[in-house]
């Protein structure tokens, strides 16, 4: 299931060699929030991971899959009602069809999510 342009939207994207910076917004009325949680939307952790994957796919123009993860940390609840714009940072190194990534979702000094892992071209 693709989340881009339905669950989340890219407001600004600044790719440069080995670094992607983006600003996104989450659709607080998306059907995912009917169950997570009604009236109090909280972005599911799996959606945070998928946001990183889809932004990388948009940058490299190829489908990727998370094949290894050293660290996945969900540090703060991310609410689309309270956090209208979310910053995304993906530091990556290409290595033989794989991408070593260090990614985070944050707003100001509040870090919601961190991921260190390996993406493989699908």
Please report, for each region that a protein language model flagged, where it lies by residue.
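HotDog/MaoC-like acyl-thioester-processing domains
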Residues: 15-18, 91-122
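Compact, glycine-rich, soluble single-domain proteins
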Residues: 39-44, 48-49, 53
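Long, contiguous binding/interaction regions
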Residues: 2-3, 72, 118
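Residues that act as N-cap/strand-start positions at coil-to-secondary-structure junctions
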Residues: 6, 84-86, 111-113
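Catalytic strand-loop segment that frames the active site of acyl-thioester-processing enzymes
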Residues: 2-43
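A broad structural signal for short, well-ordered beta-strand segments within beta-sheet-rich domains
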Residues: 8-11, 63-69, 112
């Amino acid at each position: 299931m693709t989340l881009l342009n339905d669950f989340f939207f890219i407001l600004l994207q600044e790719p440069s060699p080995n670094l992607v910076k983006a600003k996104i917004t989450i659709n607080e009325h998306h059907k995912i929030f009917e169950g997570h949680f009604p009236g109090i939307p909280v972005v599911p952790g799996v959606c945070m991971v998928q946001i990183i994957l889809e932004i990388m796919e948009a940058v490299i123009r190829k489908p990727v899959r998370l094949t290894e993860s050293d660290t996945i940390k969900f540090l703060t609840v991310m609410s689309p009602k309270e956090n209208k714009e979310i910053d995304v940072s993906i530091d990556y190194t290409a290595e033989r069809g794989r991408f070593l990534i260090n990614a985070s979702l944050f707003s100001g000094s509040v870090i919601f999510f961190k991921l260190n892992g390996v993406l493989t071209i699908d």
